[in-house]
Amino acid sequence: MEFIKITEQPSLYDDLDKKSVKEILEDINTEDHKVADAVQKAIPQIEKLVTLIIPRVKKGGRIFYMGAGTSGRLGVLDASEIPPTFGMPPTVVIGLIAGGDTALRNPVENAEDDMSRGWEELLQHHINSEDTVIGIAASGTTPYVIGAMRTAREHGILTGCITSNPNSPMATEADVPIEVIVGPEYVTGSSRMKSGTAQKMILNMISTTIMIELGRVQGNKMVNMQLSNQKLIDRGTRMIIEELHLDYEKAEALLLLHGSVKSAIEAYRRHNSTQQE
């Protein structure tokens, strides 16, 4: 099938430099409305990938996001949110970006063009057959990502990808390709815009669904979140109040004693059950 680089096609808008601020903002918002529809069409593939990942993570497997530039930064961002949000170790979801941590703030020349570097970085993490590699690249042509996915697949490791072009080279290396076709960017070729928004949405969907299925959420609450600041301590305290009907002071003391909402609630209920016996 033909590889069409939609991400490089001309914008549907012209003379951007002659538009008013309001016109530019309204145009961008109009284009952004298309992103959610494109993501919705990709849900069957997202579901397929997530369904394959869940049992792997339950057996100790990890998820590696790999990308360059905006795509790499979004992968690192999503991975970095898993420990504080769900109380998981930082080794469960790992974001790798071409050029390393320096590339999070500054471009690293030619880093994404190295076909072998991605796999070398995965080897440093002792990647194994229970793990999953998810490549992220709007174009679907990033050598750093493609090389890592190709070698991972040769070693029997599950591969997925998120791209904004159909039938891309990256998609051919994925067991489950997620193609989210958002159309030409408002600024021609600026894939940090709609493509980046779509990537962020899909990464949210993947990681959140997996964490819910792993039992890291109860009801609709982040009962395993890390208590890293006063706002989160207050949030956790109010969760306990809602669940156990304690006053604020007792709920907060219980939370701080046990370190998480889930542990605090379980300990309180065990204690009460023992008392009643």
UniProtKB/Swiss-Prot annotation:
A lyase-type mechanism (elimination/hydration) is suggested for the cleavage of the lactyl ether bond of MurNAc 6-phosphate, with the formation of an alpha,beta-unsaturated aldehyde intermediate with (E)-stereochemistry, followed by the syn addition of water to give product. The gene is murQ. It is an enzyme of class 4 (lyase). Homodimer. Keywords: Carbohydrate metabolism, Lyase. Pathway: Amino-sugar metabolism; N-acetylmuramate degradation. Specifically catalyzes the cleavage of the D-lactyl ether substituent of MurNAc 6-phosphate, producing GlcNAc 6-phosphate and D-lactate. GO terms for molecular function: carbohydrate derivative binding; carbon-oxygen lyase activity; ether hydrolase activity. It catalyses: N-acetyl-D-muramate 6-phosphate + H2O = N-acetyl-D-glucosamine 6-phosphate + (R)-lactate. The lineage of its organism: Bacteria, Pseudomonadati, Bacteroidota, Bacteroidia, Bacteroidales. Coiled coil: none annotated. The active site is at E81, E112. Belongs to the GCKR-like family. MurNAc-6-P etherase subfamily. Residues 53-216 form the SIS domain. Its EC number is 4.2.1.126. It holds the Pfam family GKRP_SIS_N. GO terms for biological process: amino sugar catabolic process; N-acetylmuramic acid catabolic process; peptidoglycan turnover. This is N-acetylmuramic acid 6-phosphate etherase.
